[in-house]
């Protein structure tokens, strides 16, 4: 049986937040205060929709955005890790569950030639409209009270594993790699024998450190892709 690898995107695969990185397109690299202050807790995707509308009003086009986005740095050691996974697809299935959007993730993965590593990317659907403005929608509707309105990562993970099982694709273990507060919910889905890998010093790591009883799986903290790579090599040896 294969191991399922689940990755967050922002501050995990890449070493920044793709949504806030796009602000570099704006003259002065700063959004108007009114727009910045319009964010409501749990409604980040709606907020980003307003940001993208503003970018369109400023005459910022697809090619401008793409040029900025492909310059975003990968987390140290992450491209080596992804190439290793790509070379061992007989042992690993690999998915992304992210609060970013389809356009940004596709640009960034394709530029580094690592898009084929991932079997599936679950994120907010985005597209350029008829006048060239970027639009984004919520990924799905859910009833989780702890997750933002656009995406419950636990629900996505549960449904993916169930669908795979129905197609006779069962996993020996799940490894979840993430950093943020919204990665806690899916980590609670993990069972004994699975591995939760929170990024050191980030929100997920802090949540788990406060109460390890939240998680049934093994916990392995990481700082660079090299540490995750070492862990995966050990899995292959056993």
Curated annotation (Swiss-Prot):
Please tell me where Mg(2+) binds in this chain: 8, 10, 179
Please give the superkingdom of this protein's source. Answer: Eukaryota
UniProt-listed Pfam families: Put_Phosphatase (PF06888)
Q: What InterPro entries does the database record attribute to this sequence?
A: HAD-like_sf, HAD_hydro_PyrdxlP_Pase-like, HAD_sf, Pase_PHOSPHO-typ
Q: Where is the active site?
A: 8 (nucleophile), 10 (proton donor)
Cofactor(s), names only, from the UniProt record: Mg(2+)
For whether the record's keyword set contains Cell membrane, the answer is: no
Q: What class of enzyme is it?
A: hydrolase
Q: Where does substrate bind?
A: 19, 99
Q: Which UniProt keywords apply?
A: Hydrolase, Magnesium, Metal-binding
- Tagged with keyword Magnesium: yes
User: GO molecular-function annotation terms?
Assistant: metal ion binding; phosphatase activity
- The record's EC number reads 3.1.3.-
- What protein family does this chain belong to? Belongs to the HAD-like hydrolase superfamily. PHOSPHO family.
- What is the protein's known function? Probable phosphatase.
- Please report the name of this protein according to its UniProt entry: Probable phosphatase phospho2
Source organism (scientific name): Xenopus tropicalis (Western clawed frog)
Q: Which gene encodes it?
A: phospho2
């Amino acid at each position: 049986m294969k191991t399922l690898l689940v990755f967050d995107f922002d501050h995990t695969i890449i070493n920044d937040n793709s949504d806030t990185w796009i602000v570099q397109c704006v003259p002065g690299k700063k959004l108007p205060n009114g727009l910045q202050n319009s964010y409501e807790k749990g409604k980040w995707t709606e907020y980003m929709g307003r940001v993208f509308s503003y970018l369109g009003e400023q005459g910022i086009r697809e090619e401008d955005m793409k040029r900025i986005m492909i310059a975003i740095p990968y987390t140290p050691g992450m491209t080596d890790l992804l190439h290793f996974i790509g070379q061992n697809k007989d042992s690993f299935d690999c998915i992304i569950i992210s609060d970013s959007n389809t356009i940004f993730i596709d640009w960034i993965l394709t530029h580094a030639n690592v898009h084929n590593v991932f079997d599936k990317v679950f994120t907010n659907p985005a597209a350029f409209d008829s006048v060239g403005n970027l639009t984004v929608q919520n990924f799905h509707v859910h009833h989780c009270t702890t997750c933002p309105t656009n995406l419950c990562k636990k629900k996505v993970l549960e449904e993916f594993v169930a669908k795979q099982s129905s197609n006779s694709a069962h996993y020996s273990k799940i490894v979840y790699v993430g950093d943020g507060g919204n990665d806690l919910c899916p980590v609670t889905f993990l069972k004994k024998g699975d591995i939760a890998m929170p990024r050191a010093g980030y929100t997920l790591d802090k949540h788990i450190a406060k109460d390890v009883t939240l998680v049934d799986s093994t916990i392995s903290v990481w700082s660079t892709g090299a540490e995750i790579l070492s862990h995966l090599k050990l899995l292959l040896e056993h």
